[in-house]
Every structure is written in structure tokens, then in C-alpha cells.
């Protein structure tokens, strides 16, 4: 049997990681929608804290089993990541409350240009014309799907601005920390999940009370709602892990662009399970445009020059000196 090429193996693992993220992300959205819309559990920030608490338990079990090796992440780096991640969660919840759904969706779409800017500034990434156009096509398609009424106010704009930048920075930082400190997805989750769980479970109940005027401890817990909360927390383990795996294997921009496939799947699943009137002609048209954009992005970014780091060449005289030095060293070694 012919040996498997390294590139083929990587492509298979990339596809598996991506499918893992899509399945868990769409699954948790459907479960959370049922939990909040049907059973009235509207405490989104506290629920996210429970998600990270469950993820923390998973990392502790994996560490005991030897699947997570000891690793180091400086406290300052952890603190910056937690600030970005928690501002992202809180900012998104506040933005949804203060803005129209249309402006909220536009804010989410603007994460792609912001992520591109971060990669250009910090990683010196250069995008080809086709890659830029394909990203634009995805934005247009998802915009047609999701953006309806668009109204904005000052405090809503500030909340959306904070949410977009903190989310983009958090996703960029996942990729950055894994590269800089040679951390696996499990290692990074082992460092970040406990801190996020602790902070969100402290802040969450107060923030949710401010947003909804309801107390999480006064919620009418029953066997069905507790089952949905448990299911949501269980799926969240896969969602959190797969996000770190995908951003580590790809980049924040690719994660955002291909991530809009989840938006389309959520719309389709929502049509079948919740809102029968939600899927109309302009939504279907937007889906088609977005999918074409994603296919174009995949082809454009994988081509030579589609997305690459800028190479800063040394001056000619400097290169010549280095070449001469290496030649003399080679002759000396031979002698």
C-alpha cells in the first residue's frame, strides 16, 4: 500500500478538526436556543461560566490520565487572554441587548476585517487580490442572510466596538500563544478554562441580572431544564476544544471565514426546529453567495501568494558578506 503523503494527512486532520467544530458549535446553539426560548433560561453569561467549569473538569481528568503534559504560560499572558476572552463574551451579550439584530450581525461580520488587520500588523501577512475579494463575497452573502433592520445608538456602538475587537484579539491570541509557547490545544485550555470559569461565574449572575432583571438563583429549575443545561455544558467541552484546535491549525481569519458556514447551518436548523418562516428567497440567495465565497476563499488562500508572510530580504552587500563567510567556513571545514 502506498504511503500516505504528509500533505494528505494534514488535510484529513484539518477537515476532521473543522467538522468537529462545526458539529459541536451548531449543536450547542440549537440546545441553547431551546434552553433559552422554550425553558426561559436567559442567563447567557452564567451559562458560559458553567461551560468553562465543565471544560476545566475535563482538562483535570485528562491531566490525571497523562494526556495533558506540564507546560508553562506566563501569568501576564494568561491575564491578557482572560481579559480579551471575557470582554468578548460580555461585549457580545451587551451588544445584542443594546443594538438591533441587524447591527449586531454587521458587528459580527466586521470581525473578519479586524482579524485581517491584526494578522497584517502583527504577523506581516499579505493577502492576494482574490483572497480579499473572496472574503468580501462571504461578508456580502452572510449579510444578505442575516441583516434585516439596522439601527444604532451610541452605547450600542461602543458595546459592539468592544465586542468585535476583544473577540478578534482573543482569537488571534489563541494562535499566538500556541505558537510562542509550543502549547497544544489541551495545554492552552488547561491554563485558560479555570480562570475563565472562575471570573465568569463571579461576574455572570450580576451581569445577567443587569441585562434581564432576573436572578439565576430564582430560576425554576426542573428535570428537563437541568438536562438541557447539562447537555449544553457537555457539548461546550467539544466546542471550546475544537475552537482552540482549529485556530491553532489555521488562523483567526480562516476560522472566521469558514465559521460562517456555521451561521448558515444554524439558519437551516432553526428553520426545521423552530421558525418555519425564517427561510425565504433572500436568505437562500445569501447562503448560496456565502458558500461560493467560502469555496473561493479556500482555493485563493491555498494558492502560492494567496496568503503569505512578507519576506524581508537582506541588503545585497550584507548577503554577499554572509555568503563569503559561509564559503570560507566551508573551505576551513574541508581542510
UniProtKB/Swiss-Prot annotation:
Modified residues (Phosphoserine): 326, 328
A GO cellular component entry from the record: Golgi apparatus
Transmembrane intervals: 11-31, 41-61, 78-98, 102-122, 133-153, 157-177, 186-206, 227-247, 254-274, 278-298
BP term (GO), one: D-glucose transmembrane transport
Topological relation to the membrane, as annotated: Multi-pass membrane protein
GO MF assignments: antiporter activity; transmembrane transporter activity
Keyword terms: Antiport, Golgi apparatus, Membrane, Phosphoprotein, Sugar transport, Transmembrane, Transmembrane helix, Transport
Coiled coil: none
Entry-linked InterPro entries: Sugar_P_trans_dom, TPT_transporter
Keyword Metal-binding: no
One Pfam family linked to the record: TPT
Region Disordered, annotated ranges: 303-335
Subcellular location as annotated: Golgi apparatus membrane
Major location (coarse): Golgi
Compositional bias segments (type: Polar residues): 313-326
Protein's job: Nucleotide-sugar transporter that transports UDP-rhamnose or UDP-galactose and UMP in a strict counter-exchange mode.
Family: Belongs to the TPT transporter family. TPT (TC 2.A.7.9) subfamily.
PANTHER family to which the protein is assigned, alphabetical: SOLUTE CARRIER FAMILY 35
Protein name, per record: UDP-rhamnose/UDP-galactose transporter 5
Organism, as annotated: Arabidopsis thaliana (Mouse-ear cress)
Gene encoding the protein: URGT5
Amino acid at each position: 500500500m502506498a504511503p500516505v503523503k504528509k500533505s494528505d494527512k494534514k488535510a484529513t486532520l484539518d477537515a476532521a478538526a473543522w467538522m468537529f467544530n462545526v458539529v459541536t458549535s451548531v449543536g450547542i446553539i440549537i440546545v441553547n436556543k431551546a434552553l433559552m426560548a422554550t425553558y426561559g433560561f436567559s442567563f447567557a453569561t452564567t451559562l458560559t461560566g458553567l461551560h468553562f467549569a465543565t471544560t476545566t473538569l475535563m482538562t483535570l481528568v485528562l491531566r490525571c490520565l497523562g494526556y495533558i503534559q506540564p507546560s508553562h504560560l506566563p501569568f501576564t499572558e494568561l491575564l491578557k487572554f482572560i481579559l480579551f476572552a471575557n470582554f468578548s463574551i460580555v461585549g457580545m451579550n451587551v451588544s445584542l441587548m443594546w443594538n438591533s439584530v441587524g447591527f449586531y450581525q454587521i458587528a459580527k461580520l466586521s470581525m473578519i476585517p479586524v482579524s485581517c488587520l491584526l494578522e497584517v500588523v502583527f504577523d506581516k501577512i499579505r493577502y492576494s487580490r482574490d483572497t480579499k475579494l473572496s472574503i468580501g463575497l462571504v461578508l456580502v452573502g452572510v449579510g444578505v442572510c442575516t441583516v434585516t433592520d439596522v439601527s444604532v445608538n451610541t452605547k450600542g456602538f461602543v458595546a459592539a466596538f468592544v465586542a468585535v475587537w476583544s473577540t478578534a484579539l482573543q482569537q488571534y491570541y489563541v494562535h499566538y500563544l500556541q505558537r510562542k509557547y509550543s502549547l497544544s490545544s489541551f495545554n492552552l485550555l488547561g491554563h485558560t478554562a479555570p480562570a475563565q470559569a472562575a471570573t465568569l461565574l463571579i461576574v455572570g449572575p450580576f451581569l445577567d441580572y443587569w441585562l434581564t432583571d432576573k436572578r439565576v438563583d430564582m430560576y425554576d429549575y426542573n428535570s428537563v431544564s437541568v438536562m438541557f443545561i447539562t447537555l449544553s455544558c457537555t457539548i461546550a467541552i467539544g466546542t471550546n476544544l475544537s475552537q482552540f484546535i482549529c485556530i491553532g491549525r489555521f488562523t483567526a481569519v480562516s476560522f472566521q471565514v469558514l465559521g460562517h458556514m456555521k451561521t448558515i447551518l444554524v439558519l437551516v436548523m432553526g428553520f426545521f426546529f423552530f421558525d418555519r418562516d425564517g427561510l425565504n428567497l433572500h436568505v437562500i440567495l445569501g447562503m448560496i453567495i456565502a458558500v461560493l465565497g467560502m469555496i473561493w476563499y479556500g482555493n485563493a488562500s491555498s494558492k502560492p501568494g494567496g496568503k503569505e508572510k512578507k519576506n524581508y530580504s537582506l541588503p545585497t552587500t550584507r548577503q554577499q558578506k554572509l555568503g563569503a563567510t559561509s564559503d570560507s567556513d566551508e573551505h576551513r571545514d574541508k581542510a
